[in-house]
Amino acid sequence: MAIVKCKPTSAGRRHVVKIVNPELHKGKPYAPLLDTKSKTGGRNNLGRITTRHIGGGHKQHYRLVDFKRNKLDIPAVVERLEYDPNRSANIALVLYKDGERRYILAPKGLSVGDEIQAGVNAPIKVGNSLPMRNIPVGSTVHNVELKPGKGGQIARSAGAYVQIIAREGNYVTLRLRSGEMRKVLAECVATIGEVGNSEHMLRVLGKAGANRWRGIRPTVRGTAMNPVDHPHGGGEGRNFGKHPVTPWGVQTKGKKTRHNKRTDKYIVRRRGK
């Protein structure tokens, strides 16, 4: 893994910082694990914008990543590490002893040729997946399930991890990167280690066009719009003279947005601001 700062041969190259990983596979991805991915432009079936700042971008295939890790007690060998345009983390193509291939999230420290395994009695080793009741307290894990059998939902992006800090009865207590502490059923499965490609946060795209390649459109300030487009719009000068709100009139500075009160009882401590 190397961090490369481009020479200022043009305005678009001046600030570019790239993350170069010579271990990544340079060929095509594994075709049986690809799926089509259509562009929506942020519109729904009525043609109305439901998600702003989306449009254009390079064509992509979706990689079918195994978040469930439900192929139990069958060892697998890492064939190669690959780039995935759909996420910040890299992925690993693994070959199981029975001949099946799957993509998994590539944890930090996983290399080509390493052996991994999923199962109740899998050894405590980077890349192995097992229920959290069998993982020692204090361990660092990623791709953590919230419901048994549903597949990993927490700590899946580059450099992400969760720490197991306690185990009581049927639950384990996790400390998330945000500072939140929450209880999860001990039967839920997690993968040992942290997600790789942690240098992803250090990259600098360097120009607006690099975001357009990724299908991200510009974010326009509300105060630069007309009154018909935003509550902050219109008027002379740049002062909109009211409390900041979203385009739909909801307060935007510090207002709580969480609605799922059903699971509040599992949150031991709220995330830090």
Curated annotation (Swiss-Prot):
Pfam families: Ribosomal_L2 (PF00181), Ribosomal_L2_C (PF03947). Residues 221-263 are annotated as: Disordered. Gene3D superfamilies: 2.30.30.30, Nucleic acid-binding proteins (2.40.50.140), Ribosomal protein L2, domain 3 (4.10.950.10). Disulfide bonds: none annotated. Coiled coil: none annotated. GO terms for molecular function: rRNA binding; structural constituent of ribosome; transferase activity. Residues 253-263 have a biased composition (Basic residues). GO terms for cellular component: large ribosomal subunit. It comes from the Bacteria. Belongs to the universal ribosomal protein uL2 family. One of the primary rRNA binding proteins. Required for association of the 30S and 50S subunits to form the 70S ribosome, for tRNA binding and peptide bond formation. It has been suggested to have peptidyltransferase activity; this is somewhat controversial. Makes several contacts with the 16S rRNA in the 70S ribosome. This is Large ribosomal subunit protein uL2. It comes from Actinobacillus succinogenes (strain ATCC 55618 / DSM 22257 / CCUG 43843 / 130Z). The gene is rplB.
